[in-house]
Every structure is written in structure tokens, then in C-alpha cells.
Amino acid sequence: MSDAAAAKRDAGFRAADMVKDGMFVGLGTGSTVFFAMERLGERIKSEGLRISGVPTSYQTAQRAEEYGIPLTTLSLHPKLDIAIDGADQVSPEAFLKYKP
């Protein structure tokens, strides 16, 4: 695994470890989020973690189902407890930047 992939995996796992039982979790799209979903799936199996994921894309919904993450919609649960997504850049002031 490359250094960049290892850093994304670590970030994803750390984000997933912030999720608590009963939370509604926004799930973005991309490699870092997919690592977070991998870890959430592990926690669901090993700890009995009970969460509901709200995916931002069809691809994310498919991956979440593969990891055993129960899903809901933003229409049914418009208030999320936490959202996990990646960022293209972070400024020194900790602002996230998107590069189209």
C-alpha cells in the first residue's frame, strides 16, 4: 500500500472510530470514505454498532451494503449526527477546498 493510500486508510478509520451507537452518518464518496465504511462494517460485526448511513451516491450505497451498513435517506432523517467525506485540499486555516 502506498503512503498516500495508507494515510487515507488511517484517516478513514479514525473518522469511523468517531461514530457512536445510534448515530445517523452521512457517507460521502471516494477512497477515504470507503476505508471509513470498511471500518464501520468491522465495528458493526465486532461491537454490534447500530448506525444508519445516508449515502451521497449510488456507488456509496452499494459499497455500504457490501460492508453491512444499514441505510436510510436524507428525506427520512434530515439531521445527521456526523458526516464523513474527503477533501481535495485543506488550507492552513483548516478550510476545505474542492478542485473541480
PLM regions: where:
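Ordered, amphipathic secondary-structure segments that act as subunit-interaction surfaces
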Residues: L80-P100
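N-terminal active-site beta-alpha-beta segment that forms phosphate/nucleotide-binding
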Residues: M1-A87
